[in-house]
Amino acid sequence: TLPVVRDGSLEGVITIGDIAKTYMDVYDSMILSKARTQYRNIARAVDGEVITGNEHSYLLNGKVVIAASSRILMSDFISRDDLVIMGDRKDAQQCAVDMEASCMVVCQNASISEEIIKQAEKKQIVIIRTPRDTFTAAQHINQSIPVKYFMTKTNLVTFKMKDYVDDVKISRLLTETGNY
């Protein structure tokens, strides 16, 4: 268990189990938006660089999708505000722009045309380019979720420096929580 501190004040605690959830909860394609994940954190998690867009803004809506289908199929599953992981296919990049995705993660340092970049800028779409392949980017993207999303913030059991060890032991035995 590790304390999460801001300006000298305890905000919460995080456990190995909490961290493991970021790897286990892979079936929730909305998790990045639920966690209000910042685009610069996404770029860091995939070892990427922000090509255009506000890296300080957040993914607030939308799901994470991989553009691996035909444009017709992609038009059916990509929605406005989604984060789309893709490769070098120009039609996939254009589809993400046309569907007004909030973010495009372009893998394997694939080229992005100036026209796509201009359209993305106009629609305030963040474009991140990464050297990682699509599989690796998709695996690592959950590592961008802020600690505050997984940490325990309530029902914390705390002690002060002047508390006696015997009292701490008794308290630990009487409570079943790991929120210390």
Where are these regions (language model features)?
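Tandem CBS (Bateman) regulatory domains
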Residues: 16-68, 140-158, 170
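Helix-loop-beta junctions that constitute the ligand-sensing/allosteric loops
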Residues: 1-20, 81-82, 100-103, 166-180
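Residues that cap or initiate secondary-structure elements
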Residues: 20, 90, 110, 163-165
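Arginine residue identity/basic-tract feature
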Residues: 6, 36, 40, 44, ...
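Feature captures the catalytic cores and cofactor-binding loops of soluble hydro-lyases/lyases
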Residues: 66-154
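Active-site/ligand-binding-proximal alpha/beta "capping" segment
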Residues: 72-73, 77-78, 92-94, 159-178
